[in-house]
Amino acid sequence: MSGNHTPSASGPFSALTPSIWPQEILAKYSQKEESSEQPELCYDEFGFRVDKEGSEPGCSQMTGSPLVEDPPQRLRWQAHLEFTHNHDVGDLTWDKIAVSLPRSEKLRSLVLAGIPHGMRPQLWMRLSGALQKKKNSELSYREIIKNSSNDETIAAKQIEKDLLRTMPSNACFANVNSIGVPRLRRVLRALAWLYPEIGYCQGTGMVAACLLLFLEEEDAFWMMCAIIEDLLPASYFSTTLLGVQTDQRVLRHLIVQYLPRLDKLLQEHDIELSLITLHWFLTAFASVVHIRLLLRIWDLFFYEGSLVLFQTTLGMLRLKEEELIQSENSASIFNTLSDIPAQMDDAELLLGEAMRLAGSLTDVAVETQRRKHLAYLIADQGQTLGTGTTTNLSQVVRRRTQRRKSGITSLLFGEDDLEALKAKNIKQTELVADLREAILRVARHFQCTDPKNCSVELTPDYSMESHQRDHENYVACLRSHRRRAKALLDFERHDDDELGFRKNDIITIISQKDEHCWVGELNGLRGWFPAKFVEVLDERSKEYSIAGDDSVTEGVTDLVRGTLCPALKALFEHGLKKPSLLGGACHPWLFIEEAAGREVERDFDSVYSRLVLCKTYRLDEDGKVLTPEELLYRAVQSVNVTHDAAHAQMDVKLRSLICVGLNEQVLHLWLEVLCSSLPTVEKWYQPWSFLRSPGWVQIKCELRVLCCFAFSLSQDWELPARREEEKQPLKEGVQDMLVKHHLFSWDIDG
């Protein structure tokens, strides 16, 4: 009868989980056996179509006897489970086995030797941590399916297009009526719903399809969750492919270390290995090696994580190293590299070579290289890539699924997402990426506009010593005794003792004895000029650059206010608690105001006296006497005074404050001040936010790069022009100065 057919031992479909057996095909097999006819299509024990030519790499190129469990191997596993749990396991009642297995060298040796195929579904769930996730999840798989069934997004449409492309040579996924297709659809849509920042990636489709061959649908889903959250670094499957791109650079570093001859060959022929191996990593070898070999690799992968991907790849390359070295040209090398996975037909040989060559490779070594090469990736490309804040870059965060808390805290600031407390948000990586890109764009603008900036080092200094030097450099910044000014308009020279100049010329000030007429020098000439025709430059610790002057170079305004400021605002908005009941205002500016005030109120009298002193005697122009905290407080107050009068929004205030910080070269120190105000940060931000994580230190290092450039940005650039200023021409009163010049003698030599 249809629906009750069972595969023959070691026959077609015998290695699959029973619920995915294709009953229609099994029924045809049964009829053919009774009539002694050969079936039209032949399938192996994994459901892959078999033909005379061997079909695809993932189908049946691996020769040997049918997949049969080794009884002694199964007994060793049973003995280990019984010993570990200190009770009689008997015929493996899995409900008595813990949801996770204690790690040990004995367990690792068993995994390396291979897991009995009949035990794989249960052991994979325990080794990977998927069973633990399944038990602890707030939402059941049924609820997730319900929530994702109507999710008509771009991801859902792309999933529909790829369903029949994922594994067309397998009977379970060959056509729209195949038994595995609706299962794959539900799993992929559930993943896209649960991880909205990832959505759908073709790599997940191939991995999920392979899992569905051996596990029930719900278990396959939780296995995918374990792969995404724990076994692979974040962004492996995101649109940026950040994690897998980083791992390709780590792989090249490991080849230098473990396979120096191959490294030399790749360099000589200028071969980009990642064009081949990125797909291997993205699918965890699901689409490139024979399914039998894949099972052995996955046994280790689910136990040890992404480390196995590097070890396996190095093992493959080592086995083919001699053949590669003997290749005649680049095309031959590239083709040989591409064909390596399909030529691997001995699991024991491959895994043995992988462990001999790279068995000493550790997670710590890989994570260290990941951090370093991720930074290189950012510096080289300057695109949407960013350095993670933890050793494994960051973890993917799920869609918020927690129930609301009760109490006044939830009423005022909404509920805390416990999943976000446990898993660091991949969004942090993307925020850093956007900021890094904005900083690089500003830096490239300076280097293109003003060549003297070309020698500036754009790679951030993440060392601990750099933070100690920050305040030393701030306190001991060079105070140039040379004062210079920028011409605001043209001044034509009529007499020998006058100094003529054109708009935006930089003039060295010789004397300011008279408040109206100053003496200056330009291009070797000295003379007097109207003081109101120039603007004194702030060059206490920097040298003026036209690239950073928004009155000369309009492009810097777009880069700072249009690119850098939004990137910084996004960082400050990440994890900002939002009032959900009262509808009150929630903006980073409010946090900055409170934090700046809190940092100076501890010594308010002293700070106030110093601010008055600076305002009265212009000490802040002649030399920095304010601490970063005091300077921040003063800048916030200054922005409020000028912008409130113009009824400016808080977004405008934030952008103007950032411009002040760039002018003063203290933007990175201000971030440290704000993040060090712990009571204020805890009041305004969620525990999983960027400002409450150690990641803010990395942002400080990124912002420090901007200190190498001299900005002269107008704080009030976005404010409407004042009518009083419009009514007073700049040249008004110059005639009086000319009269004064002819009535008195001027000492041009100062």
UniProtKB/Swiss-Prot annotation:
Widely expressed. Residues 415-439 form a coiled coil. It comes from the Eukaryota. One of its GO terms (cellular component) is cytosol. The modification Phosphoserine is found at S406. Its main location: cytoplasm. GO terms for molecular function: GTPase activator activity; GTPase regulator activity; small GTPase binding. Residues 480-539 form the SH3 domain. InterPro entries: Rab-GAP-TBC_dom, Rab-GAP_TBC_sf, Rab_GAP_TBC_domain, Run_dom, Run_dom_sf, SGSM3_SH3, SH3-like_dom_sf, SH3_domain. SUPFAM superfamilies: RUN domain-like, SH3-domain, Ypt/Rab-GAP domain of gyp1p. Keywords: Cell cycle, Coiled coil, Cytoplasm, Growth arrest, Phosphoprotein, SH3 domain. Residues 114-305 form the Rab-GAP TBC domain. Residues 555-718 form the RUN domain. It holds the Pfam family RabGAP-TBC. GO terms for biological process: plasma membrane to endosome transport; positive regulation of protein catabolic process; Rap protein signal transduction; regulation of cell cycle; regulation of Rab protein signal transduction. It is found in: Cytoplasm. Belongs to the small G protein signaling modulator family. May play a cooperative role in NF2-mediated growth suppression of cells. Interacts with GJA1. Interaction with GJA1 induces its degradation. Interacts via its RUN domain with the C-terminal region of NF2. Interacts with RAB3A, RAB4A, RAB5A, RAB8A, RAB11A, RAP1A, RAP1B, RAP2A, RAP2B and PDCD6I. No interaction with RAB27A. PANTHER family: RAB GTPASE-ACTIVATING PROTEIN 1-LIKE (PTHR47219), RUN AND TBC1 DOMAIN-CONTAINING PROTEIN 3 (PTHR47219:SF13). This is Small G protein signaling modulator 3. It comes from Mus musculus (Mouse). The lineage of its organism: Eukaryota, Metazoa, Chordata, Craniata, Vertebrata.
